[in-house]
Design a protein with these regions (language model features):
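Alpha-helical interaction/regulatory segments in DNA maintenance proteins
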Residues: 46-60
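A short amphipathic alpha-helical interaction element
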Residues: 1-44, 54-55
């Protein structure tokens, strides 16, 4: 579910153009890294706390 939220947020912001399928695959990781770079974050491709926070996604 978290991956779906991240994909949707990245799509709204123009970083992700793939299917919102909940899979943390290569295309999703590339989009995360691009977003992290634009935000001045470490480019890990992971859904870390800082990245989620910048995307406005709260962790349950």
């Amino acid at each position: 579910m978290m991956v779906v939220r991240v994909q949707a947020a990245l799509m709204r912001l123009g970083y992700y153009t793939g299917d919102i399928d909940g899979s943390l695959g290569p295309q999703t990781r590339v989009a995360i890294k691009a977003y992290q770079k634009a935000q001045g974050l470490s480019q890990t491709g992971r859904m870390d706390i800082q990245t989620l926070s910048r995307l406005g996604i709260s962790i349950p």
